[in-house]
Amino acid sequence: INDFYSSITELHDEIRKQNRIGNQLIDLLMDNESPKLEFKASLWATYHGVSGKLVEEQEEKNLKLEDSVLKTVAGFLNTDGGTLLIGIKDKPRDSGDKVAEVLGIEPDFKWLKKGKRDPEGYTHVLFELFKNSLTNPVANQHINLDFPVYQGQIICRVDVQPLPRILGQQ
């Protein structure tokens, strides 16, 4: 009976944790972009501007998108930190949309190595990109990745803590 009660308690705690994570994500999706919150449709996959549909025939990574993600993370590191959600379509301020459109990161998986086309492989690639692109060697210690699922789509949540400032530095 004690084992049963213990497992029920653990399950209940996990459900509460998942609900809390889900509620935090919904709050972010309802916000507009700001100096501390950015949405990116993807790391590499291109979407048509007007229709918003995925460009299915794309063979090469869109490195402009990758660069945009890296610049956003660098900006967060060098200011007050922030959250980047990859797999979310930008929500124009005047669109009247209450919640940003969730696209998911799965279209980016096609450029990951076979057997690594999942959040773990995505994590590895992102941290390699950060390590190779960001000039501060401790930058990765200020970045946390999470992969919540919303409406059946995997999102990459990148939480960035600001780098410490040197005394007297603005």
Predicted regions and their residues:
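Conserved N-terminal catalytic/coupling substructures associated with nucleotide/phosphate chemistry
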Residues: I1-Q170
